[in-house]
Amino acid sequence: KWHKNKKTRRNVLAYKGSLYYNPAKAQVRKLIVNGVKEIVQNYDVDGIHMDDYFYPTFSSSNVNSAFDAKEYRASTMAKSKKSIVTFRRQQVNILVKDIHSAVKAINPNVTFGISPAGNIDNLTSRYSYYVDINKWLNSSDYVDYICPQIYWGFKHPYAKFDKVTNRWMKAAKSKKVKVYIGIAVYRAGHNTGAGSRERREWKSDANVLKKQVQYARKKGCDGFAFFDYQDLKSRTSAKAVKRLKKVLK
């Protein structure tokens, strides 16, 4: 309805063949918050979990002109010379903070967290995500936990599991927010990854999941999330999962 109505058309934006809710619109944020409230009010849930895809990915040629640029130009942030990147992060911050506040107002025991992409440099890029990760990690106003998707092995050529984990744990300076590490069970036993060394690791090293849990524990993480459920039961990953379970008991 929004996309077809002239008054609300900007609530839903078309970009590269897809339709997106516009985070810069208060009506959009209210819709999402109300959806979360409906769940927490009517169902006995332990938590609300979200991925972090709030904005599409832009390029250097359109980052300042595409998508919600019209809302940015009309904003006080534009008038005060703040960048569109700062504006977009602020829209996401407002949404996340409103969700957290709504959840806690209904039931303080319900947990709210977000599972961002594992590469912090991508999260802080000018062109995508617009996740204010350092603020979220070091404030009690946005999330109860962060669960980075560190879906790489120790042998990844650029994003090695240990180095990425170290960076996340260092970023969580205040300890106000729990850090759970997302583990890629779906890769175990498969010939997958970036480069021959990582592919070999996932395919042949039945200890890879166990070693990731042991390493992250040593660095002080608060827990783990395993993606995805079906691969905890699959034949392909069975050997790695069996060894993983031994360090989870």
Put a short name on every predicted segment:
Residues 21-23, 74-90, 121-123, 151-154:
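Surface-exposed cleft-lining segments at the edges of enzyme active sites
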Residues 1-42:
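Active-site-adjacent "subsite" loops/lids of carbohydrate-active enzymes
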Residues 49-57, 81-129, 176-186:
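Aromatic-lined carbohydrate-recognition surfaces of secreted/lumenal glycan-active proteins
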